[in-house]
A protein has these predicted regions:
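S-adenosylmethionine/decaboxylated-SAM
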Residues: 2-6, 88-258
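Class I SAM-dependent transferase core
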Residues: 56-98, 104-109
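Residues that form generic nucleotide/phosphate-binding pockets
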Residues: 26, 46, 61, 81, ...
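Membrane-proximal basic amphipathic "stem/tether" segments
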Residues: 1-66, 70-73
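Short charge-dense sequence patches
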Residues: 43-58, 70-82, 154-161, 182-187
Length: 258
């Protein structure tokens, strides 16, 4: 951690637990060599490519019977406005990801309690809340820690309109502080979307927490599983065969059903 990041954390007392964790890791845990990280990414990408299946196969396997349409077609005005807001945001925080999948899975599950980690502009939050609004039920709990030194605090979830926020609990804390709070209140959840700490350590911790809270039949979805072997290792540990779906830009999404 550099000095500027340290000062940034000092101005945010709610993030002190994360500051202490990072300082502790910097003192006790050797930094993983870049060569190791690159090797892990190659191995993971190869595994993803070898296990990938079309979206249609996944939908058939889980018994999806609804009409598949893009969220941008179902809610064109909301989607267009969200794009304008994200486009005018001075901080770049990533794209929309596999939002259509999230939307339709919420409807398929008739989800009542959904948890996501990582919000950024709020694209995934938006589609989940649109699905909950369509059903007239349910709540989304989202966890997100602002990027250090990026000044993005005020833009977290910016694409989510006010009329959808009644069903939304946004907790602006790191996963290790926010998820225990959420899961104490919700011991059982229907759907979990992981898109925050991409390190192997962070994913292993988050997957374990979310999986333990999922109800039987619920789904754990993780973006960018090609980055490292964390998703593969976790799926083997719990002895579940995952669905691996190709995503935009050569990425992969992993899905596990409890």
């Amino acid at each position: 951690m550099n000095f500027r990041s340290f000062v940034w954390f000092l101005g945010r007392p709610a993030l002190y637990p994360e500051l202490f964790r990072r300082l502790g890791r910097s003192l006790t845990t050797p930094r993983t060599p870049r060569s190791h990280r690159e090797k892990q990414k190659i191995l993971s990408a190869d595994w993803c490519a070898g296990n990938a299946c079309p979206r249609e196969d996944f939908l058939r396997d889980v018994g999806f019977q609804g009409e598949w349409r893009k969220v941008s077609e179902i809610h064109p005005d909301i989607w267009r406005r969200a794009g304008e807001i994200a486009g005018s945001c001075p901080v770049r925080m990533g794209g929309a990801g596999e939002v259509d999948l999230l939307y339709h899975l919420c409807l398929h599950l008739q989800a009542d309690r959904v948890v996501e980690t990582g919000v950024a502009h709020g694209w995934s939050s938006l589609v989940i809340l649109l699905a909950l609004d369509r059903m007239g039920r349910g709540t989304l709990a989202s966890t997100d820690m602002p990027y250090a030194l990026r000044r993005n605090d005020r833009y977290i979830g910016c694409v989510v309109p006010e009329n959808l926020r009644d069903r939304w609990k946004l907790i602006r804390l790191p996963d290790r502080d926010a998820l225990p709070k959420v899961l104490r209140e919700w011991p059982a959840i229907d759907l979990a979307h992981y898109d925050s700490d991409k390190s192997e350590r962070g994913r292993a911790w988050g997957y374990r927490r979310l999986w333990s809270a999922l109800r039987p039949g619920g789904f754990l979805i993780s973006d960018d599983i090609h980055d490292n072997l964390a998703f593969r290792v976790f799926s083997e540990k719990i002895r579940r065969k995952p669905w691996v779906l190709p995503a935009r830009g050569g990425a992969y999404v992993g899905i596990l059903k409890k």
